[in-house]
């Protein structure tokens, strides 16, 4: 759905949803832009179709303009990034690049080379179902145990209460009944120290409930997913410097901020391919309020071309 620019203090999406400046203050920046929106019933998919479009448009430009001098260029697309499996089978050596950039950011000018350290946690509870009329001192309600564990985690460390460099525990799923129940979390923090502390805290909470209900009732499975790329990118300041130059040449003001999430670039950086992240112009990812600025997409494409020229020199 292509809509005209924001008018006044709100924008309607197919008469189904309304975005207001009060709820989405960053909309003010996009006054005068042409915005691509959802139809109001599902997500847009700008994360990361916007990046794909920008990369391919830049490639098309280079094919049509052989006078643009550049070095060897490698382009890659990874599936399953959103579930943390995007580079499971990515062959960095075969790819043959020294440095790379993901085009997977959002707001115009975003330049990101810090991301969360990330882990997943699964809690499985084996309850004991007894007729509720005769359950005193016998029943173990697995659903209640799952809820009890969640209540042991700091409420202030939930996504809806955190920003900037603040990490969180995010409860993403609860399933079950009295006899069996499970819950799933993602754990995030930019600081490796605080990240490890969060995992230990969850282990301690699980141990506390094991002491209360007995062995075999509750099981915790923790799995690290990816780590903050900063320590792998900072030794190569030229990668960041050239991104600054490319943006400024495109008329974009660089905004360095931590990613409150992750990219495949984080894992690629640990695989020996330093890979910071560039903006796309997409906003409000993963939901019905998602939109993308066509104007910013054009600047993202120009930033890519500028990077190619700068590295070519």
Which residues make up each language-model segment?
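Glycine/charged-rich beta-loop-alpha catalytic/anionic-binding loops adjacent to active sites
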Residues: 29-42, 126-130, 250, 282-286
């Amino acid at each position: 759905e292509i809509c005209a620019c924001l008018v006044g203090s709100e924008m309607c999406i197919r008469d189904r949803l309304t975005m207001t400046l009060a709820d989405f203050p960053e909309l003010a920046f996009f006054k005068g832009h042409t915005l691509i929106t959802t139809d109001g019933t599902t997500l847009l998919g700008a994360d990361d179709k916007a990046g794909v479009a920008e990369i391919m448009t830049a490639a098309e430009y280079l094919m049509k303009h052989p006078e643009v001098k550049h070095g060897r260029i490698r382009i890659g697309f990874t599936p399953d990034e959103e579930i943390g499996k995007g580079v499971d089978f990515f062959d960095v050596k075969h790819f043959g690049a020294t440095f790379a950039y993901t085009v997977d950011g959002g707001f115009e000018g975003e330049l990101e080379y810090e991301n969360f350290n990330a882990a997943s946690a699964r809690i499985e509870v084996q309850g004991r179902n007894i007729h509720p009329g005769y359950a005193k001192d016998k029943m173990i309600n697995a659903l209640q145990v799952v809820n009890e564990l969640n209540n042991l985690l700091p409420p202030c460390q939930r996504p809806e209460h955190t920003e900037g460099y603040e990490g969180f525990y995010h409860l993403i799923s609860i399933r079950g009944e009295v006899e069996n129940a499970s819950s799933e979390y993602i754990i995030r923090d930019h600081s490796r120290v605080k990240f490890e502390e969060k995992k230990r805290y969850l282990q301690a909470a699980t141990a506390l409930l094991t002491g209360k209900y007995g062995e075999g009732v509750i099981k915790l499975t923790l799995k690290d997913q990816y780590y903050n790329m900063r320590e792998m990118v900072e030794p190569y300041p030229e990668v960041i410097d050239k991104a600054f130059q490319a943006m400024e040449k495109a008329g974009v003001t660089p905004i360095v901020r931590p990613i409150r999430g992750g990219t495949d670039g984080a894992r690629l950086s640990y695989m020996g391919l330093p890979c910071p992240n560039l903006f796309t112009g997409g906003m409000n990812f993963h939901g019905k309020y998602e939109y993308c600025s066509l104007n910013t997409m054009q600047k993202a494409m120009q930033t890519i071309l500028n990077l190619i020229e700068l590295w070519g020199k």
